[in-house]
Amino acid sequence: MEAKAITRFVRLSPRKARLVADLVRGKSALEALDILEFTNKKAARVIKKTLSSAIANATNNFKMDEDKLVVSTIMVNQGPVLKRVMPRAMGRADIIRKPTAHITVAVSDEQ
């Protein structure tokens, strides 16, 4: 059985968030929470919150044992890009791209 949680439209770069996601893929859920707690990245906070939600979904909705949960899948997909304008010299303007990401975490009680 698999329980999942999705966080959408998070204001961070999907490329940088995937580096953090790779740290916890395949680990036990409680070990993954410990790793994310001490990872000094912005994405680690968001992924930890999503993982906690997936664990809560598993225990409350599917009556799974929290100690046996494993991070089965974790995906960081690209969301829409917010485009902003920054005025530059001589009447020019540059476009600033602010990326967003969708984070999906699934936990299961099977190995």
UniProtKB/Swiss-Prot annotation:
Protein keywords: Ribonucleoprotein, Ribosomal protein, RNA-binding, rRNA-binding
PROSITE patterns assigned: RIBOSOMAL_L22 (PS00464)
UniProt-listed Gene3D superfamilies: Ribosomal protein L22/L17 (3.90.470.10)
One Pfam family hit: Ribosomal_L22
GO molecular function terms noted in the UniProt entry: rRNA binding; structural constituent of ribosome
Coiled-coil zones: none
Domain of life (superkingdom): Bacteria
Ribonucleoprotein is among the record's keywords: yes
GO cellular component, one term: cytosolic large ribosomal subunit
CDD domains, per the entry: Ribosomal_L22
GO biological process, one term: translation
PANTHER family, alphabetized: CHLOROPLAST 50S RIBOSOMAL PROTEIN L22-RELATED (PTHR13501), LARGE RIBOSOMAL SUBUNIT PROTEIN UL22M (PTHR13501:SF8)
Family recorded in the similarity comment: Belongs to the universal ribosomal protein uL22 family.
Family matches, as NCBIfam families: rplV_bact
Subunit structure: Part of the 50S ribosomal subunit.
Task of the protein: This protein binds specifically to 23S rRNA; its binding is stimulated by other ribosomal proteins, e.g. L4, L17, and L20. It is important during the early stages of 50S assembly. It makes multiple contacts with different domains of the 23S rRNA in the assembled 50S subunit and ribosome.
Protein name listed in UniProt: Large ribosomal subunit protein uL22
Species in which this protein is naturally found: Fusobacterium nucleatum subsp. nucleatum (strain ATCC 25586 / DSM 15643 / BCRC 10681 / CIP 101130 / JCM 8532 / KCTC 2640 / LMG 13131 / VPI 4355)
Lineage: Bacteria, Fusobacteriati, Fusobacteriota, Fusobacteriia, Fusobacteriales
Gene that encodes the chain: rplV
